[in-house]
């Protein structure tokens, strides 16, 4: 007897976020590439230090990484680190909250698969 795995019937989990622009843009985030996950895990412990020191290069790298993660979405919306700071009015504390929430989301997905 043949078995059928129909990917059209699989519900893909997303983390839905609402950005702080005037339109309150809603974005449905998907699981990112493995490389982005590794980068996020690598920088997470350093984020509070960046907040304390205000190191501009580290701030820029963090905003750019978060922008690449947010750009992994079902909506086809692409954002940059500069847009997160300006258009979407995200300060660094919001970036930390986002990263923490996003890592929780990834852990839930990973645990659900096991």
Describe each PLM feature range:
Residues 23-114:
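Short, surface-exposed, charged amphipathic helix/loop patches that serve as local interaction elements
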């Amino acid at each position: 007897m043949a078995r059928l795995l129909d990917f059209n019937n699989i519900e893909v989990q997303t983390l839905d976020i609402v950005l702080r622009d005037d339109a309150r843009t809603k974005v449905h985030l998907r699981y990112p590439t493995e490389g982005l996950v590794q980068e996020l895990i690598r920088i997470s412990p350093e984020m509070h230090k960046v907040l304390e020191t205000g190191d501009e290069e580290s701030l820029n790298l963090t905003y750019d990484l978060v922008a690449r993660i947010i750009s992994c979405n079902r909506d086809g919306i692409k954002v940059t680190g500069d847009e997160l700071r300006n258009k979407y009015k995200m300060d660094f504390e919001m970036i930390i909250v986002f990263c923490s929430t996003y890592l929780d989301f990834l852990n839930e997905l990973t645990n659900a698969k096991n």
